[in-house]
Amino acid sequence: MQWLAIGLGAAIGACLRGWLARFNPMHHWIPLGTLGANVLGGLLIGLALVWFERVGSGLSPNIRLFVITGFLGGLTTFSTFSVEVFTFIHNGKLLAGLGLIGLHVGLTLLATALGFYFFKLVL
């Protein structure tokens, strides 16, 4: 049952990531879809951490696997982020690559903290 929960969550997360990828060409040096997927994933994992701690403790562990390992693992995309940064650096756009690293890491950490602390206030 664990593998089914993870697989189903991953499929849904990957479909959302695929939909968000439509926004990648909108800006010439910021792949907005990848950035959006990672920032949204950061926000949602912050919310999920608090929710599972406060509300979801009595739930089946498969639900946590579905949400965190499956859905959020399928949604967020470190490998795509890595190849986008590498492509900039390989094409001589070092500052763009470094800027992209800063955007992804900074915004994702900020979103995680916002989700975490917002849900702590609400629950």
UniProtKB/Swiss-Prot annotation:
UniProt xrefs under Pfam families: CRCB
Residues that coordinate or bind Na(+): 73, 76
Regulation acting on activity, per entry: Na(+) is not transported, but it plays an essential structural role and its presence is essential for fluoride channel function.
Cellular compartment(s): Cell inner membrane
Catalytic activity from the UniProt record: fluoride(in) = fluoride(out)
GO BP annotations listed: cellular detoxification of fluoride
Coiled coil regions, renumbered to chain: none
An annotated GO cellular component: plasma membrane
Keywords from the UniProt entry: Cell inner membrane, Cell membrane, Ion channel, Ion transport, Membrane, Metal-binding, Sodium, Transmembrane, Transmembrane helix, Transport
Membrane topology: Multi-pass membrane protein
Chain segments annotated as transmembrane: 1-21, 32-52, 66-86, 99-119
Domain of life: Bacteria
Keyword Transmembrane helix assigned: yes
Keyword Cell inner membrane applies: yes
GO molecular function ontology, one term from the record: fluoride channel activity
Entry-linked InterPro entries: FluC
Similarity remark: Belongs to the fluoride channel Fluc/FEX (TC 1.A.43) family.
PANTHER family: FLUORIDE EXPORT PROTEIN 1-RELATED
HAMAP family according to UniProt: FluC
Protein function: Fluoride-specific ion channel. Important for reducing fluoride concentration in the cell, thus reducing its toxicity.
Identification of the protein by name: Fluoride-specific ion channel FluC
UniProt source species: Psychrobacter cryohalolentis (strain ATCC BAA-1226 / DSM 17306 / VKM B-2378 / K5)
Gene (name only): fluC
